[in-house]
Amino acid sequence: MNTDYIALAKAFLVKQRLCQTCGIVCNYGLSLALRKPLVHFYPPILMLEPTNICNLHCPLCLTGNGKLLRPKGMMSLSLFQKICREVQDKIGMLILWNQGEPFLNPDFYAMLEFAAKQKFYTMTSTNASLELNIERLVKSGLHKIIISMDGITAETYNKYRINGNFELVLKNMQDLVLMKEKLHSSKPYIVWQFLIMKHNENEIEEVQKMAKELKIDKLEFKTTQIYSSEDITFLPSNHKYSRYLQEGNIFTLKTKVKNRCRRLWTQPVINWDGEMNICCYDKNGSIKIGNIQEHSFSELWWGEKMQKMRKEVLINRAKYDICRNCGEGIVQKIKTVKSER
């Protein structure tokens, strides 16, 4: 049985967390049926941003291409601990990334260790193009790590991961697998994420072989998000690997933007400075909810601004730019390959 699923189940098999999760799922279903936002429970998931600073310059990332408008910084360990303590009995999963490279935060290992003591299920995403303390990482209690590497050669990888180090990323993945074996640890569950673009779509078959050889737990292929007609050149030639319909310089999502969004019921975001976002697609924090340093989580979660947003997406979600380019409801992970162990 998948050890990652077991770890996830354990995190939620706590009375209050389980009740909260079941309750909010029912709330969401009723909200869709009644077209009225009903929220009487906490979300099961919380995304926390350790930092919005990155060491790479990926051209389709707002942080990497310099178009992120928010102030840059790193979440303090004290703020992280404050948030965790406030929601530890209600929320089961912490997603520890947003706009930035989490391991650039010098307190990140301590954050992982603290979250483990609070019995959260934790997952993070990294470019792994920096020196990692592999032993401490495996011992930290982190449940899942997503490593982004979009190529099986340095030449392919460097076309998108500007300023990245292919050899270092590969070494970190290999060392992580070996350290897990050495310490007889099932954690963290290692996911190799491969963003499909025009320049690497020809490597899809080979990367599956490579992932199995490296004993990676799971390989995930993901579609690419673009923001302007200038970005179309990154889209793969094979349209089944794209989330967009394309006609010349015009691109639209393959699926209709429906008047619903589970993330507003299940997965809020708190940025490095304490500002709450409605979701991770609001990368610049354009929709202001409030700051966790000035309000409690419950005040923000059940506050007027969040309720107003929930009501509006049930009526006309397409009015928001971020929603019109959102992958919600689209199968973004085209294919997954699990390693045979």
Task: Give residue spans per PLM region.
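Radical SAM enzyme [4Fe-4S]-AdoMet core and its adjacent flexible, acidic
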Residues: 1-12, 49, 70, 75-78, ...
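Small disulfide-bonded, cysteine-rich extracellular recognition modules and tandem repeats
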Residues: 22, 64, 264, 326-329
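Short, basic and Ser/Thr-rich N-terminal targeting/leader segments
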Residues: 44, 263-264, 319
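Short cysteine clusters
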Residues: 54, 58-61, 261, 279-280, ...
